[in-house]
Regions:
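Short alpha-helical "recognition helix" segments of helix-turn-helix
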Residues: 80-90, 95
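DNA major-groove recognition helix of helix-turn-helix
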Residues: 15, 98-106, 110
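Charged, solvent-exposed alpha-helical segments that act as regulatory interaction surfaces
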Residues: 20, 24, 108-111, 115
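Long, charge-rich, low-complexity alpha-helical segments
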Residues: 95-100, 126-130
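Alpha-helix boundary/capping detector
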Residues: 25, 37, 110-111, 121
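Short basic alpha-helical hairpin corresponding to helix-turn-helix/winged-helix-like nucleic-acid-binding
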Residues: 1-77, 81-83
Length: 130
């Protein structure tokens, strides 16, 4: 694992599909099944936020997971901060503060991971140097 667990999980959460199509036609899955790699990445990141971006806060696992999920969701599918706060039983300002901390942390990791991948591809002459 050249990038490390943190970067790997961030990239998995960003780019892996959260669901796969399911052709079983059973009512239990509604035509799609969850991607275990994506689910595991979200869980890993949610746990990691406890000792990093949300260290020293009272954010429990549900709040951390909601923040991580919200960060990676497409804007059109994203719940508002008010909805997030209501679902987690916290006030809107606290939800906004937690989201801001999580987003800033993940953006730094994503940027570092992209740079590392770009450098590796350049070293292998897969892409040209900028």
């Amino acid at each position: 694992n050249a990038l490390g667990n943190l970067a790997e999980n961030v990239l998995t959460a960003r780019f892996a599909p959260s669901y796969y199509p399911c052709a079983c036609r059973s009512a239990c899955c509604g035509g799609k099944k969850t991607n275990p790699e994506w689910i595991n990445a979200i869980a890993w990141l949610s746990n990691h936020m406890r000792s990093t971006a949300l260290f020293g806060t009272s954010a429990d696992y549900r709040i951390r997971r909601t923040c991580v999920l919200r960060h990676f969701q497409a804007k059109e599918n994203r719940k508002s901060l008010d909805q997030m706060a209501d679902a987690c039983g916290i006030n809107r300002q606290t939800a906004g503060s937690y989201m801001s901390k999580v987003a800033k942390f993940i953006k730094v990791i994503e940027s570092s991971a992209y740079s590392a991948i770009s450098d590796k591809l350049q070293d292998l002459n897969v892409v040209g140097k900028n």
